Amino acid sequence: MTRSQKTEVQARFGATAEAYVRSAGHAGGPDLERLVAWGRSTGASRLLDIATGGGHTALAFSAFTPTVVATDLTEPMLLAARAFASGQGMTTIRFLGADVEALPFRDAAFGAVTCRIAAHHFPAVPPALKQVARVLLPGGTFLLQDILGHEDPELAGFILEVEKRRDPSHVRALSQAKWVEHLRTAGFTGLEEAVVTKGRPWEEWTGRMRMTAEARAALDRFVLEAPARCREAFSFTVEEGRIRAFTDRMLLIRAHKSY
Ligand SMILES: C[S@@+](CC[C@H](N)C(=O)[O-])C[C@H]1O[C@@H](n2cnc3c(N)ncnc32)[C@H](O)[C@@H]1O
């Protein structure tokens, strides 16, 4: 029997929680800096970070936000994130188990909500956005970052296969146009968008998900045998037949819940 999407998420991230806490790509970069700059300008006093993973976004926002609540579906991830935040001297973030589709908060409880590099794991985006809109104050800010989906079908199919082979809990990466459509439908306005690139060192990126040697070898073969335009589109670097790195594009969106 195939595991449900959420069970798959818990299995994958439960086994790799420590690696996510240590991941340099999650700990910082121009993407997190942009979210933080947007966040500072909101002046929100209560922030919810959904799908907090290793807790890096929650930690960054706690430097200037009095109340930060961080939620995630995966219990070991929350334990690792809590220990990480405490180790950084930040003991005020409240970590809580919660599915994004059933957030255990009253309506209009937060001035800002963040969701960074996680929505590609959600079974569906509209129910998640409905919850985000519900827990935000009217006029409140939603800061989203996720892997940007490609508009070109061949390139989109190629990178989806790469992602799913590495992590079967990856569902899809939406295009910019699709995100804008979903956000507007959920009642968000005043959208501001940015795209930044993020380097993915191959050994670290594949290693973090603890692939078997066979699955990793098959993934390498899939990439190396793909049409050259696929590798070029994601700036794959290959030296002496070995994949070294590639580049993801990240979509960042600032949106406001309408009054
Ligand atoms: C890559 S990590 C997130 C990284 C983190 N936000 C950061 O800024 O470093 C993805 C996280 O999404 C969580 N997740 C996936 N599906 C979820 C869901 N339906 N509800 C809540 N969390 C979910 C996983 O458990 C995992 O911890």
Model-identified regions with their sequence ranges:
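A short SAM/SAH-binding and catalytic strip from SAM-dependent methyltransferases
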Residues: 111-124
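A short glycine-rich, Lys/Arg-flanked "PGG" loop and its adjoining helix->strand segment in the class I
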Residues: 126-141
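Conserved class I S-adenosyl-L-methionine
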Residues: 1-42, 56-60, 77-80, 87-88, 143-165, ...
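Class I SAM-dependent methyltransferase SAM/SAH-binding core
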Residues: 48-102
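A short acidic, Gly/Pro-enriched loop at the edge of an enzyme's catalytic core
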Residues: 101-112
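Conserved Class I S-adenosyl-L-methionine
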Residues: 54, 190-259
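Short alpha-helix
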Residues: 172-186
